[in-house]
Amino acid sequence: MPRRCDLWRIGIVRAAIVEIAATGLAGCEIQWLAEEPSFRFLADPFGLWREDRLFLFAEAYDYRTRHGVIDLLTFDAELRLLDRATVLREPWHLSYPYVFEADGATWMLPEAHRSDSLTLYRAVDFPDRWEVVTRIALDVAPIDATPIHHDGRWWLFYSGGPNREDRMGALHAAWAERLEGPWHAHPRNPIRRDRGGARPGGTPFLNGDVLCLPVQDCRHTYGGAVRILRFNRLTPDTVEMEIGPPLRPPVDTPYREGFHTLAACGSVTLIDAKRIDRSGRGWLIDLARRFRNASA
């Protein structure tokens, strides 16, 4: 069977995350980033504004190496691309570069579960230079770890587990008094099991006084849609939540077979959407990569 390849593309939506969560992407003005070269993609966008500049961090992935790095794309106030560079590279695959500000510093918490660890980085010279601060130990090797400071403590939401079903459909939580830890796994972990809405997919936000978390709907395909998980109660001992309907990818683009990031960034919101390549070239690329590795 030909190898199917998910190819993602990032969009900048001129709407706030609360608006999109309420009504979806239909009718929204979306500025799509340029397509990547063949069998490469940018995904998992997160960003910060500084002095009328949008600093957008994303996973840059090439199917020829099957290794993700973190790229930075810088835009001006009119969302014109000014620069692009790789700012974080490790021996292991990196993705989901959750970037945020806290305690007078700028932090990044990229997904790196293939390293069996979660590493917290701090900007030494934003946005280009980052240093390792600590490695966070949790009950599973975390996937798409998503932090937020809420109700006087830090919370961390993540997926993970020994099999694909857990990685797609199990949501865990942990809490800490300080960002650097120690972190305490929630006693009800996994706090949610649902392939249709458990794996984190963007920035948490408040709707009124209710904490909301974008999660991925993976029932039909990986990252098929985004849903909003509302926490009606969240303490170190208890959790009560409800989930909203799927938010679908835009239909007026070839990238309409998936949507798995919804990230607030000031007056704009960052998303990604995918198309699936079914040509069989992915199988040939895999074969060539394995041959190169065997010959090395």
Predicted regions and their residues:
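Carbohydrate-active catalytic/glycan-binding domains of CAZyme proteins
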Residues: M1-A296
